[in-house]
Amino acid sequence: MNYFEKQPQTKFQSQQEEYQKQLMRSKSPIFEGAEGELYYIENVGRWLPSPKIINRRESTKNLYKGIRHAALSYFQLNDIEWWGQSENLYFPTGHTLSSQIHCLNHLFALRADKDAVLALIQTLLPNICEILPSPIDEKFCHMDNYPYKTPSYISFEFTCENRTLLNERCNKRGANCTSIDVFVYAKDSDNKHVLIPI
């Protein structure tokens, strides 16, 4: 198998893509009526809105409204780049199938709720007995200008020595290097500390 060739979509991926397209076409309140990004269709000979990519001016509407401001602040204060925005890496992608966006929309609101994170993790890993504060976000809790004073139990865009271990150009969280979308730091029933990638 050649991993560099585009792989066929799974049934789930196809269903999700069609669902996102339906939401965009119907001007769903989920995306607050955002328009699709324009792209040129050669065989049609004109520019048409994308059925699954929100235009760059409205790309923040790809984030759930209830977490939008906090997620944007989290990325800015932690100097995390957004995936897929070549012009401005400080705004989220408009791609409605982005794993980065999906992780934030589903998990960001839980990040400070230790019990909720534990319950979520134990559905798959019942031997996890404690969720620990994130070591990469913990340092920011003590900064005067950092708005989140409670520990974070879910972290986003984790990297670790990418230059050395993966021979990549950078170690920066987010775009342009290999990152784990989400990770949780925990302790299992054997008292071992574990990193759980999501």
What are these regions (language model features)?
Residues 1-197:
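Charged, terminal alpha-helix-loop-beta segments
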